[in-house]
Amino acid sequence: MRVQWFCFFLSCLTRRVLRGGAELLFDGIKQHQVTLPNQSNPWDIRQLLVWIRHNLLKERPELFIQGDTVRPGILVLINDADWELMGELDYQLEDKDNIVFISTLHGG
Amino acid sequence: MCEEEEVYCPELQDTTQGKSLGKTCMKCKESSAVLLIRAGDAFCKSCFKEYFVHKFRATLGKNRVIYPGEKVLLAFSGGPSSSAMVQQVQEGMSRDAPKKLRFVPGILFIDEGTTCGMSHEERQQNMSEVQNVLQQTGFPFYIVSLEQVFSLPGSILQRGVPEQRANYKQEVDRFMVQQQAQGETGCSDILENLAKLGVNVSESSRESDKMFQSTCRHPPDTHTQKLIQLFASAKTLTAKHQLLHTLRSHLILHIARTCGYSKVMSGESCTRLSVSLLSNISLGRGAFLPLDTGFCDSRYGDVDIIRPMREYSLKEIAFYNRLFHVSSVFIPALNTKVLENSSIQQLSEVFINRLQADFPSTVSTVYRTSEKLNVSKIDANQGTCAKERCLLCLSPLDTQVGEASAFHATQISHYISQKILMKFNDPANSSGKSCCQEGKCCKGPGYGDFCQPRALQAPSFVDMLCYGCRLTVKDLQSLDALPQYVLHEAEHRSRRIEMRKEIEEFLLDKDEENLH
């Protein structure tokens, strides 16, 4: 029974400015620290996206998630590394993982 | 909020190293990779920084358009690309840079909050945030609101005279000699050096800087109202985008001219350029692709727009900003939270991004294509037809083409589809004209519009535009909402054309002149 914690920043994050577009869909909150409910299988990014969609997205989910993955043009960083190096949707989350979503789309 | 990140840092490194699926940096082959630039090209953090910084300097070095000591205006929007650009210039100027950049930068931010209905307070907040970021750069900066387009002079729509420059190498040599001389006299004041070079950084321009900053604080309400009206009169989001782009370029040009900048750096990434390549083709601006997407855009003559970020993809920029803590400011724009099919620009972006997700070489392919495009022969002989430029975008007009062209075909079809309307209105039109000459109007106000000078002017106004700008103007409900400088310049031009026609008989042809 493991409790998972991760910080959930949205946007181009810097020490001073913590904004970058995608947060508009999340009620203006840039950073989320969430505890995922326990489940028998380990959590992966695919399940995390479904969870985000149901629990965090306040409006227009299609602007963030399309199909079972993120909208093309939104980058995903897992612990400050490209998710393409980490297995993308199949990456298994660990305790205290830090996932960042950066929108490269014009207008955020 | 950031503290957490710092607390996690040591652990983060452990996890990344353990889980990079065995991928190491392709360059140093030691550290574990953090970023995949292209399929198979994985970079570690330090190699990525080196690569990124090198690319910026290589782009500038390869093109040799910025002369040493020249004043360069950095167009800053708050977004990731222009933030990265400003940071790169800062990096290049820093003392420990191996080959220091030798131009003199200034930064311009244009507040466009009105266009997307932001309140005064929100705009103030954005501006103070931008100010905080810009103050840290140490460069002089201007914060200007888009409302200032209503006080622009008509001369902004005239092409400037390109400055005659000696060979790049000679200029560099001259600069070096001057710097050496300066070093001997012990005078390290860069301002004086510039004054010697004839670049205008006088106190008066400093004062004008202050003027811009102070006026931007409180744009007059009448101007704000006018701007809202103008954007409300555009029927489509596509037209709004084009309109904003046009006004913004005029304002940038104006600030550059009044403050003595001869180059403007614009931070478009290659992702953005491939999107605008596709959308510009769809918008009927295909003839100007080399100007709109190329490295150096010299349509204004005296001020060149250069795009030093065009070798970077947005992914690289986003990673760079994130990994090296480059501050950017997020400001909602016209296309924030809009539907995918709301405008042509938006649609092209979605198209490119979708393709890119499945075929990772999409952007680079489109971008390489844009690189191969060259200025058409119209621009090659610009010396002869320098006057015939689009009123709005200042590109050489693409409407003087042969009979058997797509342009003429669309013109004819447009004419024919209007003919029915014209027939319907014909008696009103002809009688309207005759009654107007007599100084009275026989019809009601609805028909009366027909003999208003503005309505009569409309066709000639459209004639001064390129095909792409015609489409944008067609989407405007009325031309009256356009800023005064556009209307003035249009009037000015049509008067000149008339005058030219009047004295045409007395003018000597160039060929004739040669004969005599």
Curated annotation (Swiss-Prot), chain B:
**Pathway as given in its UniProt record:** tRNA modification; 5-methoxycarbonylmethyl-2-thiouridine-tRNA biosynthesis
Name one matching Pfam family.
CTU2
Question: Membrane spanning segments where?
Answer: none
Where in the cell is the protein located? Cytoplasm
What are the record's GO terms for cellular component? cytosol
Q: What is its main location?
A: cytoplasm
tRNA processing recorded as keyword: yes
Which UniProt keyword terms apply here? Cytoplasm, tRNA processing
Keyword Cytoplasm belongs to the record: yes
What domain of life does the UniProt record list for this protein's source?
Eukaryota
Describe its function: Plays a central role in 2-thiolation of mcm(5)S(2)U at tRNA wobble positions of tRNA(Lys), tRNA(Glu) and tRNA(Gln). May act by forming a heterodimer with ctu1/atpbd3 that ligates sulfur from thiocarboxylated urm1 onto the uridine of tRNAs at wobble position.
Family to which the UniProt record says this protein belongs: Belongs to the CTU2/NCS2 family.
Q: Which HAMAP family match?
A: CTU2
This chain's protein is named Cytoplasmic tRNA 2-thiolation protein 2
Organism, scientific name: Xenopus tropicalis (Western clawed frog)
Q: What is the lineage of its organism?
A: Eukaryota, Metazoa, Chordata, Craniata, Vertebrata
Q: Which gene encodes it?
A: ctu2
